[in-house]
């Protein structure tokens, strides 16, 4: 799924790169930068000297290859602050210009999506971490989570949605994902 969307959203990257270069050159105010960068899952951090990027992993699904790519990115860009979020995304903080520009391209080359991870776009879909192995689950919802994410990604840049639209699935009678 992500590979298809990363190829689709690559066409938007020049807009992000231009805004990011202007932000670091102080030609774009933080609020103006946020208006562009937020849709790419990237935000200027307090003080306007660094940025944060949010990587989408639908339902918190991190495959072995994803973990290897994250490890390599951490080494390559000397990343010091990695945050695994409650929305089952991964964030890298305190990024300088060369780090964010290179990292963004590497993510898209590896099929890791950032588009729509912020701003007025559907956020990462969350789901219970134990789906597929939880003895109390009604059925494994993983494929439904992936299909729903694919559907919501199709709205990016096409339909105006409510701010921070969040979708979560659950697979048992409990409220494990806090839906």
Where is each model-derived feature located?
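Small-residue-enriched alpha-helical segments and adjacent helix-cap loops
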Residues: 25-28, 50-179
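Iron-sulfur (Fe-S) cluster-binding modules
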Residues: 1-53, 65-69, 73-77
């Amino acid at each position: 799924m992500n590979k298809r969307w990363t190829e689709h959203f690559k066409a938007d990257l020049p807009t992000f790169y231009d805004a990011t270069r202007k932000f670091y050159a102080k030609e774009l105010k933080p609020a103006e930068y946020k208006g562009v960068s937020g849709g790419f899952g990237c935000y200027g951090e307090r003080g306007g000297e660094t940025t944060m990027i949010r990587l989408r992993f639908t339902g918190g699904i991190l495959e072995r290859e994803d973990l290897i790519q994250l490890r390599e990115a951490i080494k390559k860009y000397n990343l010091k602050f990695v945050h695994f979020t409650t929305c089952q995304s991964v964030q890298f903080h305190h990024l300088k210009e060369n780090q964010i520009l290179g990292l963004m391209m590497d993510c898209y080359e590896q099929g890791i999506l950032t588009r729509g991870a912020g701003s007025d776009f559907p956020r990462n879909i969350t789901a219970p971490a134990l789906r597929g192995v939880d003895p109390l689950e009604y059925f494994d919802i993983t494929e439904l989570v992936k299909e729903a994410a694919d559907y919501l990604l199709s709205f990016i840049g096409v339909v105006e949605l409510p701010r921070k639209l969040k979708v979560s699935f659950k697979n048992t009678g409990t409220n494990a994902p806090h839906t």
